[in-house]
Amino acid sequence: MGTEAFLVSVKGNLTDGRDSTCRLLPGSVLSFAAEGKSFTKHWILKLLVFPDNSKEKKEMEVLKKITNFVSKYMAVIVIAMAALALFAPQTVSFIKTSYVNTLLGIVMFGMGLTLKPHDFKVVFSRPKDVVIGCIAQFTVMPFLAFCLTKVFQLPPELAVGVILVGTCPGGTSSNVMTYLSKGDVALSVGMTAVSTILAPFLTPLLTYLYAGEKVDVNMLSMFLSIVKVVIVPIVLGFVVNHFFSKFTEKAVEVLPLISTTAIVAIVAAVVSANSAKIMTSGLLILAVVILHNVLGYALGYCIGKVLKLDSTKCRAISIEVGMQNSGLATSLAATHFAQYPLATIPGAVFSVWHNVSGAVLANLFARSAGQDK
């Protein structure tokens, strides 16, 4: 979750030769406001005002250091929390699965805060590349999910979870992985934006197509959920960033910390709530998730090669196809398939796994790019 994990701003020369900024916000934002906690409120207020004294500046510097540390070791932190939730679920039982939608909505607002009009430039300057990538996104992963449910003969409660992961848009953490892989960052950002915009229409339709025989799928209800939890917060964040950019520039510096904390919370909530069942079928779920993710990488890259795209574009499409907004998959499973508690598990496991595999693949791609030179 997807990306579905941290925000990174990277400046560099993209394939069109211009200096651009890649902004990335995978995952969700943790807020315990509903539980009366004041941490989030405190820091939101501080971030909306530039520090005007040495004490506040020092606090911000400390927060930035924590943010950098959490971003760097995000995969390790998520794995550790997943293990804790699995083997000692009572320690994180205070994090409820009912928080998932709120967390995802807040992170999408954060994603909107990082978006600028030029992030959509690639959609108009290179529409062919974006179309190829998005078609691959919404054909490869849903079809792979469907095939895996058949091959492994998954029960309906797990099958719908796997299919939801496949039908969701690309995860936003794919942007930073593309940057690390020396891929086409502009294309990655454009694909993420377009696939997210298309999600309210295609995710319910594809879920109905591939899972409709197993479970009841209410497409209209899913459409409204995605609009409410994803599209509206992104638009609001985009508008706020446009009119209050001086304030949001300071806020985005620590969004990775909030985002990563949220992913950890979502994983902890889902895993702890289903720890007993995971212990009995965990290896099966993990095998399906790994195959889904790795085959997505491979087929995404192959599609780019077959269509004679250059290596930077192939790397971007590979990572974009393989990494999903698994946070959205978890949210939809919890909201629309509550009668199947295990449906949330594939999304949670995918959130852990794809951040690990994405980093490994990005490193391999980067080495390959270096050897080519």
List PLM regions with ranges.
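N-terminal chloroplast transit peptides
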Residues: 5-6
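Family-specific functional microsites
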Residues: 30
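Alpha-helical transmembrane segments of multi-pass small-molecule/ion transporters
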Residues: 13, 37, 46-47, 51-373
